Amino acid sequence: MYFCTKVIEIIKMRKDMENNMFCFQCQETAKGFGCTLKGVCGKNATTARTMDLLLFVVRGISVVADQLRQHSLPVKKDVDNFIVDALFCTITNANFDDESIMKRIDKGLVIRNDLKHQAFAKDI
């Protein structure tokens, strides 16, 4: 079972957030302030939150990878490729497939944890 599947289930269970979202990702956003019920592009709240979670994971990967590079340690090209893929999958109207986004989250967590282990091994 995917880690993020549980996260999404918890999000869906929260009655007060059931139909709410906040997405300010694109130029289509209503009045330039962000979509709060459903995206002008058609994105629903669950997909918006799943994308937010993926971007949170990408930020974590980026922070650790940056620290490794600042200490002149190698970071695999796969890390950069993952970041580009994850960012591209969140662009407007490109991917509303929650399952594929969750798979990326799971993969990202593995990458982040591997990088963290590498950093800890070097006392970074």
Model-derived features with residue positions:
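Long hydrophobic alpha-helices with heptad-repeat/coiled-coil character
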Residues: 1-2, 34
